[in-house]
Amino acid sequence: MTESIISSRTASISSKEGYEIRQGSTDSSSLDLEKKENAVDTTIAKPFDSDEDIADVEKAGGKKINNSLIDETFAFMQDAKKLDPLTPKQESKLKWKLYIYLLLMLGFLDMMLFIGKATLSYSTILGLFDDVHITSNQYNNLNTLFYVGYIVGQFPGHYIMQTFPLGKFVGLVTFSWSVIVFLHCCAYNYGGLIALRFFLGFTESCLLPAMEATMGMFFTHQEQAFLQPVFWISCLSCGIPAGFIAYGLEFVTKSIAPWKLFMIITGGITFFLSIFLFFYYPDNPSKARFLTDEEKLYTIDRVRKSTRGGIENKIFKKHQFIEALKDPITWLFTFAAFTLMLSNNLAYQQNLIFTSLNVSDLNSTLVGVALAGYNTVSAIIATFAMYLIPNQSAYHAMFWMLPSITGGIAFVALPWSNRIGELATMIIASDFGITYIIALGWTTATSTGYTKKLTRGLMFMVGYAIANIISPQLWQSRDAPRYYPAWIVQIVVAWFVTPIIYLVARVILARRNKQRKELKDKKIAEGSLETIEKTYVDTVDEFGNPVKVLIDNSMLDLTDMENLNFVYPL
């Protein structure tokens, strides 16, 4: 099927030649890819006839950029000869391989990540309060301190994540997090827990952005949208294994406290996971050990054709950082993350509310399992809905606010004596998590340029963390057991205002798409479409001589503002 997968460089740069990206091969004996609409374009360059050709490109609107903007996968693609187009059967096989390997690995990591966050919550029904002598308000402070560490860790974490191999970064961070979970067993007072929760938040802070970055490297925009709920089933369902572990530990009569055993079990699983991740977590598709060289090429080609942008770049770019901060979409997503996550502490208060409703510690774990099951079903429904109705992320996110608003109002309105009704409405109110899942994927999918993408993700997580610093303080013991102030903030700010922000973002992105379509139609009419699809790069050959290379924008680390061929997913 293929002539060759990896070969010597097909477009070796000479001292006298510039190079032009074009669909087609570098020698006359190869089959012209222009005749095959779906062929994989792995040929990188073809010599210009003269420097005048390059000047013409510049006059036509081509951009001269530094060689550092070239994508990390460029060299791998440049070392490959063309491949025949994938048959439907081959593409299906490749997609399922990506789904199974990546979603299982990322899903398990995500599940352990959220179990790690919730260890303190489960410990409250396993004897933590009595052993460490803390109050409910101090418990809320510990949840706040976790997110203080979370926000502090965002800035150094994102920088390290961009400049170092992603797989090694994820493995080492996971190892550090497992050690901190183990150390919880040594805490004997409030002060010890303060330090541990802060550093746990610090170490976990960049794992979620790293996983989202990986999703963006391996899956197309459409796949990312409907796979987000599938990926997040691992988080939403984490209460099932964690709940059953906690349930079993309720029967432990050994001298070691049940909550310490819970820490040992979760920390131990995370420790072994970190070893696996260090060796097998992929930096990008070209470094994925579970893919053949041929599959790596097809994966890169599928993604860059979908996103019309690069895969990864290890150089921090100040102009992309500034552009991200100036882009109103960045601030809309950041503000939406803040407003929505003002309701996130509901997950950490549920066990305490169960106790207030006279549900035993033993039965509280089972109610938590039921809650996780409900959230899992909601995620499955959301997945099918986004698959059947693609490119409507804003409307999907808005829809899943309706159950939360309904459940929240019902919880406040029902009499406290209606225990079953209160439990049911609180479970229904938890559907806001689906909106968060959709928004997180949409946030990164609407930007290109690796530094800009990471900056936007950082800003989103800052909004997320600030809200989570505030939200535990809404649940003051003086407001127990109904906590009316907390519920009012959740219903009005988190679940009503947030969808409006998403709608505004959609309007802005739709307007940008319309302007780009008009520009593209104009360029087609003028016969100059290449000026918005390709960019020429000044670089040097192996002898140090300056050369000029015209490269498809999808192989460059351009932002969505620089790459006018990029179409925003809505």
From Swiss-Prot:
One GO cellular component term noted in the UniProt record for this chain: plasma membrane
Annotated region described as Disordered, given as residue ranges: 1-34
Lipid bilayer topology: Multi-pass membrane protein
Principal place of residence: endoplasmic reticulum
Phosphoserine modified-residue sites: S14
A GO BP entry: cysteine transport
Keyword Isomerase in record: no
Similarity section: Belongs to the major facilitator superfamily. Allantoate permease family.
Protein name (Swiss-Prot/TrEMBL): Uncharacterized transporter PB1C11.03
